[in-house]
Amino acid sequence: MTDTTGPLERDRHRTVFGEVAEQYDTGRPGYPDRLVSDVLEFTGLPAVEALEVGAGTGKATRAFAARPGVTLTCLEPDPRMAAVLSRTCAGRPHVTVVETDFETWRPPDRHRFDLLLSAQAWHWTAPEVRWSLARENLRPGGTIALFWNDWYVSDDALREAVAAVHDRHLPDRPPHSILEKVPRDSVMARDSWVPRELLADGGFTDVTHRQYPSVHHRSTAGLVDVLSSLSFYRALRPATREALLADTARAVDAHGGGLRLDTRTGLFLARTVAGG
């Protein structure tokens, strides 16, 4: 996961997920329970008021909302994603969904939170303001938790077959973990742009990085759902996307009709400087 998008591309791409909101919710792997426990433990609080940025359909929201003492205000700019989020979190009075983007939203009465979390979404925020806004929305000593999943096809022959399909349809395709070999260490490394920006901002301390391996199994249709939810697929011309996904499905079917996704979740934690 990198952060090289410009403002126009970022604004366009962060709202393409709503085109396949249901596939996004059913297809994408969730987040490890251990990660949720570690984030809440890092706050050091028995009850946590959390602000979630780019909540999507609630993949992370539901995991945190299931924990006692956690209340969530969830920001999601895409109305289609927000609709799924509202539905999947219905009946949870401690979850509030706000259809807005992080950059323009302001909390009522300048309220500040114990925890700001963002799952698979922080790279879509505006680099020039995201860290200052995070500090403004957090209490002194509050926690920021940013995490991403990277997915890898563990079967070498299948991965090579899927990569060959992509190379045929998209010779200039952007890199993605799902087409790469499983690394020994998470690509969400300690020296990625996240800790560099956190430290450069000067308003955060106790910067911490953790990794969580997990395994998920997907059918051919399940993999197509995962791929369909990726931003660079959504940005393709429909005819190109449909042909690419159809040939990918045929490649998976030829290798047994299912696959194992080795998932590496990278988590970055930090605290706002006390007294900030």
Segments (PLM) and residue ranges:
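Conserved catalytic/acceptor-binding region of the Class I
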Residues: 140-213
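Conserved Class I S-adenosyl-L-methionine
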Residues: 187-276
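Class I SAM-dependent methyltransferase SAM/SAH-binding core
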Residues: 51, 57-105
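Class I SAM-dependent methyltransferase Rossmann-like catalytic core
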Residues: 18-29
